[in-house]
């Protein structure tokens, strides 16, 4: 009988420790998308922030070929632009050509009388930006001299020849008349005249060609005047010649007049090049030209311009990304990544966004997971997902708009005497690149910080929206989950997700279940404290009883206590 009573009491105690059945409660967790391996990006506060997705902003590779669309790309082949302009015999195919971009090859060479251009870079740039070699011959009158001088160093076919756009004037019989020729510009566009002066290798050659011991060439307009004297002397032999020609150029504005005065050594113009204002350019490159479409061209080849930055080459043509030093800059296009924990306990408990993200979400960035009497489930929240996507969409385009300037960066050249200018130019360019590289990194960090903040904010908005619906019917578990204190089947869970949940319907049931569960939790929670207090009181009582027994025994003489000193 005693055994039966003890067994009944034990069963009753065990039953009292069992909480209310899970059929009468449910758990609802809120979370966000996560991936197993995220991408590290820079923000204002952290250089290594992991996000679910990011887009590379720096174009670091080229196609390896120059695309001939949408621009007219002219392959210079074996000719430089200046040789083609002067009319070098092996460059005759380029006469009257037009281009958006003239491509000079490293294999280009001159094959006529050796020459130099004192202001080579400026002339090359002017002709390149004009985008045409359109030439108009004019009827210059050269009296008292012999025209169309030729050289064995400049052969057209099997015959001696000369630059087709220049007229080499030499003595007529035994004299060289003083020349004074004028040519007005009665048109409404600028005219580019190319002329030169011949530097013989010896005095004998000078008098043999021009009679006078020293000639002179003066070319003037209303705005400028140039007087050049020949420098007679031997130079290194080039194509059988130790003499040289120096090439000069003059631009005549509408209404202005070109005046040429000379008594020898003149390399005269045959006409003018029509100047055009445009955005044509020139580039040195050995990349092959192919049929394809890219709007940005570099010496390495064409590159896409769908990114705001590139570090392929400083020299570009077309609609190109901004050159920066960094090889990579990643723009966050997803939220902060917190990979999901693989182990969730014996019973597969679910956790909310405060603990970790959720992998495998395919129907949204944010969503719900639940456990109820019908099992477990997961669904995305389209409203918060779309709100985040709308703010992130267009972010890349906005960055491109801020940085992708529609212009071409031409290469800059300087002669040796302009070395200090070249050093200054290089310093300025390097400083600009440093500044843009810093600005690019700061801009991306700002955008990344904004992206992470706004995605975190959408998660918090969803959590607050859910909490306001549930009110006292559920309790915040502190990990992004709610403990719902009433029976909540899948239809009930769906009403919470879509915002149609009516907490009044479940309020009484929730309050009743909450009271029962809390009382059990309270009893279970204070059990350890009660045990410790009981143990302490028991020990105290045992000590008191033991002390009393000792005192009683001493009084009766049953115990003797001897103290020796």
Swiss-Prot record:
Disulfide bonds join 29-481, 67-292, 79-91, 112-154, 296-320, 488-492. It is a single-pass type I membrane protein. Residues 551-565 are cytoplasmic. Keywords: Clathrin- and caveolin-independent endocytosis of virus by host, Clathrin-mediated endocytosis of virus by host, Disulfide bond, Fusion of virus membrane with host endosomal membrane, Fusion of virus membrane with host membrane, Glycoprotein, Hemagglutinin, Host cell membrane, Host membrane, Host-virus interaction, Lipoprotein, Membrane, Palmitate, Signal, Transmembrane, Transmembrane helix, Viral attachment to host cell, Viral envelope protein, Viral penetration into host cytoplasm, Virion, Virus endocytosis by host, Virus entry into host cell. This is Hemagglutinin. Palmitoylated. In natural infection, inactive HA is matured into HA1 and HA2 outside the cell by one or more trypsin-like, arginine-specific endoprotease secreted by the bronchial epithelial cells. One identified protease that may be involved in this process is secreted in lungs by club cells. Its main location: virion. It comes from the Viruses.
